[in-house]
Amino acid sequence: MPVLTDPVQLLQALIRCPSITPNEAGALSILEQFLRKMGFSVERPIFSDKNTADVENLYAKMGNKGPHLMFAGHSDVVPPGELDNWMYPPFEGIINQGKIYGRGAVDMKGAIACFIAALARVLEKQPIKGAVSLLITGDEEGPAINGTVKLLKWAAQKGEKWNAAIVGEPTSVKRVGDMIKIGRRGSISGIITVKGRQGHVAFPERAANPLPLAHKLIQALTDTALDQGTKNFQASNLELTTIDTGNSATNIIPAQTVIRFNIRYNDLWTKEALIAEIEKRLALVHSENNSNQYPYYQLEWIQNLGSVFLIKNDHLIEILSNAIEIVTGKRPECSTSGGTSDARFIKDYCPVVEFGLPGNTMHMVDECVTLDAMESLTVIYERFIIDFFA
């Protein structure tokens, strides 16, 4: 069994578990073995939902009284892609020239290993004056239906309450500790289906081409910026992700066009206000095109991606920032950039910050992390844990 205080040995063991969402593949079993040896109680609830795979999760806790700190993360990883493109096999955890290679090294088995090693180092020196829990899901890289959101609810129903949480997502950029996340933009997706009538291009009067209306709808979505950004957030942006007619022929007017888009929005918007704005823009085109007849459009919203949030707990941010400065000599940038994470669920239960390894190789071929970065993150986590319970 790897040494508890060595994050690299634990990371190697975790990488060797091919835990592609939603497969547990032994990763949670390794964590359970480690955590029980450290004195944690461990539970592994499995959650299910319609049309989704069952997902096993892990909740471990040590202590009962005093401040309660949660570390949240995920043991699942994205697929490695073509194995021949990798310098080393993605599920072997090979170390070469000061780097450990493997899928999940950065996102985010590395941070899990660092936090556990940091806690083991603290416990070698002093007891924890409070409670520590680890909330690890196997459904972060997937639909995120049977993971953190249900694990939080399950734990809360058992009476669990947390004072603060840290999520080990790879927030650092060039070096460990140069950036932490104190909030995230919201995310919402939409699908516009423009219905037409299929026909021969030589007889347009017998058909209804959906593409001209689709073009006008796209213009309505993209011609005017949503905003210019705020003090804590960059500008909201709407991005088209697909435009599809399902038609490869040059002599057929298509029957429909499907437009998919995503919006990342800042704190100038609520989800409801943003939906109203988009629907208003489209409605202007809708009426102009007499859309009670072909062609016409239908709009569907996908709303489970997370709302905008900003953590205003200065004490938590200060503890983490001070720990980073003590170890690295520099204070971190507090940012809200990037995509969504499971922090969007945790913020409904307690203040949450995100901090982990540099993410420049996450989801890429030859994903890797330096051994120096692993040690730096472990030392910072150790300092953070000590100061949190001081």
UniProtKB/Swiss-Prot annotation:
Pfam families: M20_dimer, Peptidase_M20
Enzyme class at the top of the EC tree: hydrolase
Subunit structure: Homodimer.
Keywords, ordered alphabetically: Amino-acid biosynthesis, Cobalt, Diaminopimelate biosynthesis, Hydrolase, Lysine biosynthesis, Metal-binding, Zinc
A Gene Ontology biological process term: diaminopimelate biosynthetic process
Signal sequence region: none
Classification of source organism: Bacteria, Pseudomonadati, Pseudomonadota, Alphaproteobacteria, Hyphomicrobiales
Catalyzed reactions: N-succinyl-(2S,6S)-2,6-diaminopimelate + H2O = (2S,6S)-2,6-diaminopimelate + succinate
CC cofactor note: Binds 2 Zn(2+) or Co(2+) ions per subunit.
PROSITE patterns (UniProt xref): ARGE_DAPE_CPG2_1, ARGE_DAPE_CPG2_2
Stated name of the protein: Succinyl-diaminopimelate desuccinylase
The keyword Zinc is assigned to this record: yes
UniProt: Zn(2+) 2 binding residues: 107, 141, 363
Domain of life, source organism: Bacteria
Annotated function: Catalyzes the hydrolysis of N-succinyl-L,L-diaminopimelic acid (SDAP), forming succinate and LL-2,6-diaminopimelate (DAP), an intermediate involved in the bacterial biosynthesis of lysine and meso-diaminopimelic acid, an essential component of bacterial cell walls.
